[in-house]
């Protein structure tokens, strides 16, 4: 499946080379991107990173729009240098002129949020649940103390967790 994506990167570069009548160095392509971003262009490393999960779930649009979007960042950087805005007129020129695509800044793919465990802390106040992140819960275990803003008592772990 990533072979189609790599082929689309190559096609985008060939289009840019035909349009600008010059060669561009090919980037390294990585699929080590997670979370909400569909793709990232690392300008100084000449590296493209893509979110394989979002690619699998939105293959057609991803190949057409997202790959061209990220390649356009590298091409714009190689043509115009560091002093351009990420989604500025130079990048937009490449999206419209070279790839004949709308210069959309963001994707609208459904992104699965990961489940997060919250650790419930309490104080003597009524209805005083304080959901702590795993990081804050760990800090409490290391000796950090948190106080209730109302009663100024130390918050105590209730032994309960909640998945959000």
Swiss-Prot record:
Q: Which UniProt keywords apply?
A: Cytoplasm, Metal-binding, Zinc
SMART domains registered for this protein in UniProt = SprT (SM00731)
Which family does this protein fall into? Belongs to the SprT family.
Q: Which gene encodes it?
A: sprT
User: Which NCBIfam families did the record assign?
Assistant: PRK04860.1
Subcellular location per the Swiss-Prot or TrEMBL entry = Cytoplasm
Copy out the cofactor comment: Binds 1 zinc ion.
Q: Which residue range or ranges hold the SprT-like domain?
A: 13-156
The UniProt entry, under InterPro entries, shows: SprT-like_domain, Uncharacterised_SprT
Q: Which Pfam families match?
A: SprT-like
One GO MF term on file is:
zinc ion binding
Catalytic residues as annotated in Swiss-Prot or TrEMBL: 70
How is this protein named in the record? Protein SprT
Cytoplasm: present as a keyword of the record?
yes
Major localization class: cytoplasm
